[in-house]
């Protein structure tokens, strides 16, 4: 089975479980809490190469890995998240954790009617331009938009917006390439 399909399947199962759990005072929902915990655990794992070596080593037993995770995160994560981590270890899916977290975040955002957009521009956008672009994206999608920004001077001018599997390319670089193709087709 492909890695992405495995990550989606586990993320969907966890999302379903978290969706059914009781709402907690500090959080709007258990989904919010689990999402926050998954991101925190993922950050700890990504930033600690020794921990990665232990978790991903095939000769270290599942029990040893679960004990390690339990010691690291006891009292810091919910039973839902702790049980999920144990399940991943039992099923030898711990190497999929980062991808599962990303898929869970997508599901949580979809449940909140939020879409993420990555905006790349040739130069840094000012606050007014960011606000204008965000309003346009909200109008186009009908959803709340979480936007991240990056600068790529090779675009020459304009912006490229990525939302899921959709790309809106308004860069001068692409327009010039298109014009070049049309001119070459004429000659």
Curated annotation (Swiss-Prot):
GO MF term set: proton-transporting ATP synthase activity, rotational mechanism
PROSITE patterns: ATPASE_DELTA (PS00389)
SUPFAM superfamilies: N-terminal domain of the delta subunit of the F1F0-ATP synthase (SSF47928)
RNA-binding among keywords: no
Keywords associated with the record: ATP synthesis, Cell membrane, CF(1), Hydrogen ion transport, Ion transport, Membrane, Transport
InterPro entries, per the entry: ATP_synth_OSCP/delta_N_sf (IPR026015), ATPase_OSCP/d_CS (IPR020781), ATPase_OSCP/dsu (IPR000711)
Keyword Membrane assigned: yes
Signal peptide: none
Superkingdom, taxonomy of origin: Bacteria
Membrane topology designation: Peripheral membrane protein
Subunit comment: F-type ATPases have 2 components, F(1) - the catalytic core - and F(0) - the membrane proton channel. F(1) has five subunits: alpha(3), beta(3), gamma(1), delta(1), epsilon(1). F(0) has three main subunits: a(1), b(2) and c(10-14). The alpha and beta chains form an alternating ring which encloses part of the gamma chain. F(1) is attached to F(0) by a central stalk formed by the gamma and epsilon chains, while a peripheral stalk is formed by the delta and b chains.
Task performed by this protein: F(1)F(0) ATP synthase produces ATP from ADP in the presence of a proton or sodium gradient. F-type ATPases consist of two structural domains, F(1) containing the extramembraneous catalytic core and F(0) containing the membrane proton channel, linked together by a central stalk and a peripheral stalk. During catalysis, ATP synthesis in the catalytic domain of F(1) is coupled via a rotary mechanism of the central stalk subunits to proton translocation.
Family statement drawn from the similarity comment of this UniProt entry: Belongs to the ATPase delta chain family.
This protein's name: ATP synthase subunit delta
Naturally occurring in which organism (per UniProt): Pelotomaculum thermopropionicum (strain DSM 13744 / JCM 10971 / SI)
């Amino acid at each position: 089975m492909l890695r992405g399909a495995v990550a989606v399947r586990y993320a969907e199962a966890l999302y379903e479980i978290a969706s059914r759990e009781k709402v907690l005072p500090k959080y709007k929902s258990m989904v919010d809490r689990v999402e926050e915990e998954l991101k925190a655990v993922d950050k700890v794992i990504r930033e600690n190469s020794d921990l990665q070596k232990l978790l991903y080593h095939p000769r270290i037993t599942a029990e040893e890995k679960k004990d390690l995770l339990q010691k690291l995160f006891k009292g810091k994560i919910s039973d839902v998240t702790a049980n999920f981590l144990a399940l991943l270890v039992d099923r030898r899916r711990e190497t999929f954790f980062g991808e599962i977290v990303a898929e869970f975040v997508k599901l949580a955002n979809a449940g909140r009617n939020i879409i993420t957009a990555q905006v790349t521009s040739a130069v840094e956008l000012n606050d007014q331009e960011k606000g204008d672009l965000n309003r346009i994206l909200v109008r186009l999608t009908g959803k709340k938009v979480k936007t991240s920004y990056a600068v790529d001077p090779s675009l020459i001018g304009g912006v490229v917006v990525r939302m899921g599997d959709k790309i809106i390319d308004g860069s001068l670089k692409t327009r010039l390439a298109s014009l070049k193709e049309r001119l070459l087709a004429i000659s």
